Amino acid sequence: MKGLKKKRRIQIITLAFVALAGSTALIGYAMRDGINFFRSPTQVVEAPPSETEVFRIGGLVEKGSLVRGQGETVTFRVTDTNATVPVRFTGVLPDLFAEDAGMVGTGRLVDGVFQASEILAKHDETYMPKEVVDALKEQGVFQHTEDQPQG
């Protein structure tokens, strides 16, 4: 009788381990496209990611760089004042998207041009995405104002 209980306990533990491993594998598989790493323009220029890697880039839209092309295609440059990366986006830009304003884009770097699939802009004068603030602070160009929340 004791041998049967021990055998049953081992079977339950083994089954629980297999279920846990399967659940972990399914969660990892489901999240593989949902994790995008943030990079500043300086990081992109210094160590360009592969063309298949989806990542986020953030900084300020360089003054005088915004060019509206055919249809919904827009090109501009994003900078952290140390490096600049050209960006190409086809779609509708957020209403508050403007030159010399903060932005975060999601996409891939293809032939030195960031091909954005999504562009986000700061929603008012006091908000800037935390990743952009951190990158600009690291470059020494971020100026904190009284009414600006700290990330």
Swiss-Prot record:
Binding site for heme: 123, 127
Gene3D superfamilies for this protein: Nucleic acid-binding proteins
Record has Heme as a keyword: yes
Protein keywords: Cell inner membrane, Cell membrane, Cytochrome c-type biogenesis, Heme, Iron, Membrane, Metal-binding, Signal-anchor, Transmembrane, Transmembrane helix
Gene Ontology, cellular component aspect: plasma membrane
Protein name as it appears in the record: Cytochrome c-type biogenesis protein CcmE
Signal peptide start-end: none
Single GO term (MF): metal ion binding
Membrane topology classification: Single-pass type II membrane protein
Entry keyword Transit peptide: no
Compartment(s) where it occurs, according to its Swiss-Prot or TrEMBL record: Cell inner membrane
Cytoplasmic-side positions: 1-9
GO biological process, one term: cytochrome complex assembly
The gene coding this protein: ccmE
Biological role stated in the UniProt entry: Heme chaperone required for the biogenesis of c-type cytochromes. Transiently binds heme delivered by CcmC and transfers the heme to apo-cytochromes in a process facilitated by CcmF and CcmH.
InterPro entries reported for this sequence: CcmE, CcmE-like_sf, NA-bd_OB-fold
Periplasmic side: 31-151
UniProt similarity note: Belongs to the CcmE/CycJ family.
Transmembrane segments: 10-30
PANTHER family per UniProt: CYTOCHROME C-TYPE BIOGENESIS PROTEIN CCME HOMOLOG, MITOCHONDRIAL
Main location: membrane
Pfam families in the cross-refs: CcmE
